[in-house]
C-alpha cells in the first residue's frame, strides 16, 4: 500500500484528490442516493445539518422553525456549488476555511475538541457522504 493510500485510510488526509476547491472523485463506486441523502440532512441524530443550516422552504423540511441560521442556507446549494465542491465541504470544510465551524464529517484524525464517544470515528461514512452530495445537487 502506498503512503498516500495509508494516510487516507487513517483519516489523516482527505479521501480522494483535492483539485482547487473540490474533491472531484466520488468516495464510493456506488452513486449517491438523493433520498437517503435527504434523510441524513434532515436527521436530528446523524447529520445534524439543520442544527446550523436552514433547508429549502418546502415539504422537504416542514420543521422550518427548528432550522439553524448560523451557516449558509442549503437552498440552492446544487446551483451554487459543483459536486466536487460539495463533497469537499462535507468531508472536511476546514480544507477551504481553517476557521470554519462546520465539523469534518468524514475525517477522524487531527481534530480537536471531539467528544469521547466520537474519538477516532467519522460522523458519516463514504456512502453517506455521496448520498448527501446527491441530495444537495438536487437543490437548484
Task: Enumerate the predicted regions with their spans.
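Domain-scale selection of a single, long terminal region
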Residues: 1-2, 15-19
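Gly/Gly-Pro-rich "capping" loops immediately C-terminal to redox-active cysteine motifs
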Residues: 31, 50, 54-95, 101-115
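Sec-exported extracytoplasmic/periplasmic mature domains
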Residues: 42, 79, 91-95, 134-140
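Short pre-active-site segment immediately N-terminal to redox-active cysteine/selenocysteine motifs
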Residues: 44-48, 56, 128
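An amphipathic alpha-helix signature
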Residues: 83-91, 126-133, 137
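Periplasmic OmpA-like peptidoglycan-binding domain that tethers envelope proteins to the cell wall
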Residues: 116-123
Amino acid at each position: 500500500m502506498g503512503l498516500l493510500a495509508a494516510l487516507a485510510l487513517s483519516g489523516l488526509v482527505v479521501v480522494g484528490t483535492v483539485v482547487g476547491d473540490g474533491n472531484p472523485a466520488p468516495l464510493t463506486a456506488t452513486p449517491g442516493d438523493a433520498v437517503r441523502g435527504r434523510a441524513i440532512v434532515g436527521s436530528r441524530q446523524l447529520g445534524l445539518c439543520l442544527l446550523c443550516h436552514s433547508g429549502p422552504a418546502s415539504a422537504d423540511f416542514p420543521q422550518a422553525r427548528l432550522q439553524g441560521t448560523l451557516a449558509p442556507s442549503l437552498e440552492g446549494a446544487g446551483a451554487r456549488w459543483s459536486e466536487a465542491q460539495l463533497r469537499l465541504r462535507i468531508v472536511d470544510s476546514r480544507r477551504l476555511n481553517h476557521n470554519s465551524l462546520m465539523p469534518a464529517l468524514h475525517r477522524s484524525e487531527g481534530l480537536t475538541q471531539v467528544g469521547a464517544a466520537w474519538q477516532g470515528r467519522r460522523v458519516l461514512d463514504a456512502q453517506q457522504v455521496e448520498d448527501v452530495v446527491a441530495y444537495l445537487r438536487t437543490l437548484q
